[in-house]
C-alpha cells in the first residue's frame, strides 16, 4: 500500500510525496532533494511558497519520519537510517523557513529586492549540511524570490518603473 501526502505548491503546482510502509521507504519526490531548490526558476514560473514548502516537509517528517529507514527523491541519492532521515528533513525544512522568515524581516526593515539577497547570510545550521548550501538554488536568489512573492519585483526606485531600453 501507499500513503500519500500532497505537496502542491512546493516544487510544482501539483506535487505529492508517498510512503511505502511495508518497506519503510519515504519518497519525497522533489520536495526534499540533495540540494536547495530555486524558489523562482530562472526559466520563469510562479514564485514557489517557501513557508508552505517548510510546512509540507515538516508534515511528512511528523507523519512518516519515525517509520522511515530510507528517504528517496526524484533526482539524487537516498538518505539512509532514521537518524539521517530525521536530520536531513529538519535541515531541508529549516532552510526554506529561514529564507522565508529572514527575507521578510529584512524587507520589513526597509531593504529592497536588490538588497535582501546580499544581506541574507548562510545560517549556522547550514555550514555542514551540503544539501542545503548554495548549489542549484541559493540564498541570494531565493531571498529575492520570497521578496517578489510578497512585495512584487519593484525595487522602490521610481526610475526603475519604466527604464529606458538598452542601446542597440
Predicted regions and their residues:
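Intrinsic disorder at enzyme termini
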Residues: 148-168
Amino acid at each position: 500500500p501507499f500513503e500519500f501526502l500532497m505537496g502542491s505548491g512546493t516544487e510544482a503546482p501539483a506535487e505529492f510525496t508517498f510512503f511505502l510502509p511495508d518497506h519503510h521507504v519515504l519518497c519525497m519526490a522533489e520536495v526534499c532533494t540533495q540540494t536547495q531548490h530555486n524558489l523562482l526558476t530562472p526559466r520563469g514560473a510562479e514564485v514557489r511558497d517557501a513557508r508552505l514548502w517548510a510546512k509540507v516537509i515538516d508534515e511528512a517528517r511528523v507523519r512518516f519520519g519515525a517509520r522511515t529507514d530510507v528517504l528517496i527523491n526524484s533526482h539524487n541519492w537516498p538518505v539512509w537510517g532514521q537518524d539521517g532521515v530525521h536530520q536531513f528533513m529538519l535541515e531541508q525544512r529549516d532552510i526554506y523557513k529561514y529564507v522565508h522568515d529572514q527575507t521578510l524581516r529584512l524587507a520589513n526593515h526597509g531593504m529592497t529586492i536588490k538588497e535582501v539577497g546580499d544581506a541574507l547570510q548562510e545560517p549556522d545550521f547550514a555550514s555542514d549540511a551540503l544539501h542545503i548550501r548554495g548549489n542549484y538554488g541559493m540564498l541570494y536568489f531565493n531571498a529575492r524570490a520570497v521578496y517578489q512573492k510578497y512585495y512584487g519585483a519593484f525595487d522602490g526606485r521610481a526610475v526603475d518603473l519604466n527604464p529606458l531600453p538598452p542601446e542597440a
